[in-house]
Amino acid sequence: MASLDTGAYKDLYHDYASDDQARIEERKLVGGLEGDALYVDATFPASGSSLYYNEHQPPKYGIPAELVEWNRIGGREIEGCVEPVFVSEAPGGGGVKQGALRDRWFLSALGMVGSKPELLSQILVSSALWKKGIYTVKFFKAGKWRYVHVDDKIPCDRGGRPHFARSCDANEAWVMVVEKAFAKLHSCYEAICAGGLEEGLKDCTGA
């Protein structure tokens, strides 16, 4: 991925030495928050720029940015997600449900990874601070594991229904979080609409 190699998206991911370092940095990101304050990811804002290449010209399947509400997982603002958990006791058991985004190639890979707990746990680096609204995920890109921190704001319609992917278990958050982190790694959700299953599996497993 040339743009990643040249650092075009360098502010959107981190080349940490290990998962432990990523968790330390995650704690630093929320360390200054006071009281009930929640993490807000300024590098991938809750706005049209995180949805599309051009927020004023969404693709044909796209939802106008002004109609999107960014709802928090931890705030129980998402339809059906009344008792949110990152991964249920049966990881991947509920399956992956595609939304409006044309990223089936990635979701197919994600569904396969989600059916194997040892693979899923590899990319889900941290949900320890989910109550502060932050998660950390990693993907294998351009020969390295790239770490991505995201907040828990998910693009939804005004009824709280996620526009994009989610788990078939509405309380399970990992699918929404991982898709958002993957979109951030590539600059926006629209950017992950093209790809193949083999590429998606490598991104999620390193193999």
Segment roles from a protein language model:
Residues M1-A207:
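Structured alpha-helical subdomains that flank or immediately precede key functional sites
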